[in-house]
């Protein structure tokens, strides 16, 4: 546990609550002190949904500390069972309440005796895992619980559906553009004649989990959640899975070819012929997606060789790095992720597409790297957007964590062929057009930016004279920030505290020497 101003992945209980509140008719009870119960507010504010968040906080207060939690927790579980009539109640502590070292499994066993619904304790180590790891683990735990129970009762139909079908595993609440990605994947599967057996956890029902083995195979769009469940289903029920993320022209085509491979396992036996999706890939790439055409246009060629910095969760950071490098010819000077648990896979995927790799969940390290590399554009999370604003570098948001702007009402997927159009727009609009900025500064107007670009670490020990500020304002905006930082670096090295025009020229000469 650590105290942080900013965390890319939240504490473990948030991941558990995200999974539990994604299912239909599942209620979560959070055993937590006041202050840890912000999930309801966060979800209500960010998700564009009409339903109340099905999470109740069982508050740890002074009375609980004096008498113990059992009575209160059992009472809350029983009450919610009667009021809401859920199929499942998930009990989770938080990292704070875990300090009490209470036997919560015993509370669950006690309450199960008097409850009509199933009750389980989230099996997560709150000190060892983060939000995404906990979400993956909780989803696997729920799937295992119901499938193992169905196997015991001999209530599992292992026969596959008559027509090609798929389970989509990993869409859940508060995900980055996931509602839109889900719609896009549904459309893609419909075009390919593949039926959707189940989507879990988003909108899924725990009573239907026993039917998961009826699908021909599983799809896991994001590495962060779903892989543990897919691995379990493969091991126990022999269900193959596709884990390629269909983001960008190249990977979407690869994804569809993998679907074709698995559909053809049973195609002859079930539908009498083997499928071929090559004509669909060609049609979509050339006529539906504008990205392939755009990447050959003069607009995109203007971006060739531009420097970009990419950072986010492993799925989006890898996909974005590949798209920028191989589909748009943009130089990715650094690709990074905060998913340290997935660092090996991340390095394997991006090593040939970028110059540097950054594996860290410390936002100050990310900010310092951006300030040092001075890219033309940043593609990252909400935090990188803040960093970009302070440095005067444009930023496109491509990964969670994000704020309300990235829960749009309009249709903006990142997956599939429509997603390629969205990404192409985001990339092109993220790069500052240097001449545009320069003209605005020449002619003035409400868009005129501040003369001096702010640096990430504000140097209070350096002052610019009026003359040097005036001289700096004559420099075009797209290189001004770099010149300012180089001048300040030179001044610090020489022990100068007041930057004059002469110091500016001396700094320039020292660089060109």
Swiss-Prot record:
Could you identify this protein by its name?
Answer: Light-independent protochlorophyllide reductase subunit B
> Can the keyword Metal-binding be found in this entry's annotation?
yes
**What's the record's note on cofactor binding?**
Binds 1 [4Fe-4S] cluster per heterodimer. The cluster is bound at the heterodimer interface by residues from both subunits.
Annotated localization: Plastid, Chloroplast
SUPFAM superfamilies, per database record: Helical backbone' metal receptor
**TM ranges:** none
Q: Which reaction does it catalyse?
A: chlorophyllide a + oxidized 2[4Fe-4S]-[ferredoxin] + 2 ADP + 2 phosphate = protochlorophyllide a + reduced 2[4Fe-4S]-[ferredoxin] + 2 ATP + 2 H2O
Origin organism of this chain? Chaetosphaeridium globosum
Name the residues that bind substrate. Answer: 434-435
NCBIfam families reported in the protein's UniProt record? DPOR_BchB
Q: Which PANTHER family match?
A: LIGHT-INDEPENDENT PROTOCHLOROPHYLLIDE REDUCTASE SUBUNIT B
One term of GO molecular function:
oxidoreductase activity, acting on iron-sulfur proteins as donors
Binding positions for [4Fe-4S] cluster per the UniProt entry = 36
**GO biological process terms held by the UniProt record:** light-independent chlorophyll biosynthetic process; photosynthesis, dark reaction
**Keywords recorded for this protein, A-Z:** 4Fe-4S, ATP-binding, Chlorophyll biosynthesis, Chloroplast, Iron, Iron-sulfur, Metal-binding, Nucleotide-binding, Oxidoreductase, Photosynthesis, Plastid
This protein's assembly is summarised as: Protochlorophyllide reductase is composed of three subunits; ChlL, ChlN and ChlB. Forms a heterotetramer of two ChlB and two ChlN subunits.
- Assigned GO CC terms: chloroplast
UniProt main location, coarse? plastid
Question: What family is it from?
Answer: Belongs to the ChlB/BchB/BchZ family.
**According to the UniProt record, what class of enzyme is this?**
oxidoreductase
Q: Name any cofactors this protein relies on.
A: [4Fe-4S] cluster
Respond yes or no to whether keyword tRNA-binding is given for this record: no
């Amino acid at each position: 546990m650590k105290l942080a101003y900013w965390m890319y992945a939240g504490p473990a209980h948030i991941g558990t609550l995200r999974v539990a509140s994604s299912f239909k008719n599942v209620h979560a009870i959070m055993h937590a002190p006041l202050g840890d119960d912000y999930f309801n507010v966060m979800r209500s504010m960010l998700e564009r949904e009409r339903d109340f968040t099905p999470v109740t906080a069982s508050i740890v207060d002074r009375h609980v500390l004096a008498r113990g939690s059992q009575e209160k927790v059992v009472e809350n579980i029983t009450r919610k069972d009667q009021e809401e009539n859920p199929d499942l109640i998930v009990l989770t502590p938080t990292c704070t309440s875990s300090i009490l070292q209470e036997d919560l499994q015993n509370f669950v066993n006690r309450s199960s005796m008097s409850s009509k619904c199933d009750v389980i304790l989230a099996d997560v180590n709150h000190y060892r895992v983060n939000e995404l790891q906990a979400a993956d683990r909780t989803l696997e735990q729920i799937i295992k619980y119901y499938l193992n129970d169905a196997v015991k009762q001999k209530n599992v139909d292992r026969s596959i559906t008559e027509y090609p079908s798929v389970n989509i595993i990993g869409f859940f609440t508060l995900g980055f553009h996931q509602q839109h990605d889900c719609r896009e994947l549904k459309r893609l599967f419909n075009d390919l004649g593949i039926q959707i057996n189940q989507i879990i956890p988003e909108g899924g029902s725990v009573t239907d989990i026993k039917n998961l083995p009826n699908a021909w195979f599983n799809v896991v769009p994001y590495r962060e959640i779903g892989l543990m469940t897919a691995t379990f289903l493969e091991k126990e029920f022999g269900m193959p899975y596709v884990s390629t993320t269909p983001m960008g022209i190249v990977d979407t085509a690869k994804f569809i070819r993998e679907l074709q491979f698995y559909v053809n396992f049973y195609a002859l036996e079930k539908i009498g012929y083997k499928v071929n999706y090559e004509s669909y890939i060609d049609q979509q790439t050339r006529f539906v997606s504008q990205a392939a055409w755009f990447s050959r246009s003069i607009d995109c060629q203007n971006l060739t060789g531009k420097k970009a910095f990419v950072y986010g969760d492993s799925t989006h950071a890898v996909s974005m790095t590949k798209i920028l490098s191989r589909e748009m010819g943009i130089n990715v000077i650094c690709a990074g992720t905060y998913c340290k648990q997935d660092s090996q896979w991340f390095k394997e995927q991006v090593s040939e597409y970028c110059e540097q790799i950054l594996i860290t969940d410390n936002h100050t390290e990310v900010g310092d790297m951006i300030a040092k590399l001075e890219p033309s554009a940043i593609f990252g999370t909400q935090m990188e957007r803040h960093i970009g604003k302070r440095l005067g570098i444009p930023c496109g948001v491509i990964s969670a964590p994000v704020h309300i702007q990235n829960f749009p009402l309009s249709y903006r997927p990142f997956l599939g062929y429509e997603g390629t159009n969205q990404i192409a727009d985001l990339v092109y609009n993220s790069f500052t057009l240097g001449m545009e900025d320069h003209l605005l500064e020449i002619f003035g107007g409400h868009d005129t930016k501040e003369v001096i670009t702010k640096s990430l670490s504000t140097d209070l020990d350096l002052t610019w004279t009026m003359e040097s500020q005036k001289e700096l304002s004559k420099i075009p905006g797209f290189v001004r920030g770099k010149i300012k930082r180089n001048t300040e670096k030179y001044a610090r090295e020489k022990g100068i505290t007041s930057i004059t025009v002469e110091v500016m020229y001396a700094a320039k000469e020292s660089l060109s020497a």
